[in-house]
Amino acid sequence: MANLIIDIGNTALKASWCDGITLGKTYRYQGERMLDFILSMVEKEKPEILVLSSVRNFTSANIQRLSEVCDKLVVVDEQLLDLYRLPSWLTPDRAASVIAARYLFKGKGCTIFDLGTTL
């Protein structure tokens, strides 16, 4: 069973199915009905783990709905920042980058360039 990672930024929703650290098919959506788009992605295949990083306000009802379509929902929020001892001023997308880099480069120094839509 695959996992689904989703990043909702200021400009668009980006998502990818993945198996471990290997990314699969990726998606980009720029409409207003983000929850509906996510639900359409999981109609045919239920993700084991769904990871959500969002700089937009995602209601608790939407979070609850997402928890119903996967085995485990991980939301990059203040609790996750505390768990990884990250500063509270980090946005969820940047925090996800730091957590991933720590996993991929365990015990090594690492510099992360995360420019979002700056370029």
Go through each PLM region and give its residues.
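Gly/Thr-rich phosphate-binding beta-strand-loop-beta motif of the actin/hexokinase/Hsp70
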Residues: M1-G24, A101, G107-L119
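Short amphipathic alpha-helix with an adjacent loop that forms part of the alpha/beta core around
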Residues: L35-K44
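Short beta->alpha connector loops
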Residues: G31-M34, R56-F58
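Conserved phosphate-binding catalytic cores of ATP/NTP-utilizing and phosphoryl-transfer enzymes
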Residues: D82-I112
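Short beta-strand-loop/turn "lid" adjacent to the catalytic site in phosphate-handling enzymes
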Residues: K44-P92
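Short amphipathic alpha-helical segments and helix-helix/interface helices
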Residues: L39, I63-Q64, V98
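Glycine-rich phosphate-binding "P-loop"
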Residues: S16-E32, L83-P87
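A general structural signal for short secondary-structure boundary/capping elements
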Residues: F58, A96-A100, L119
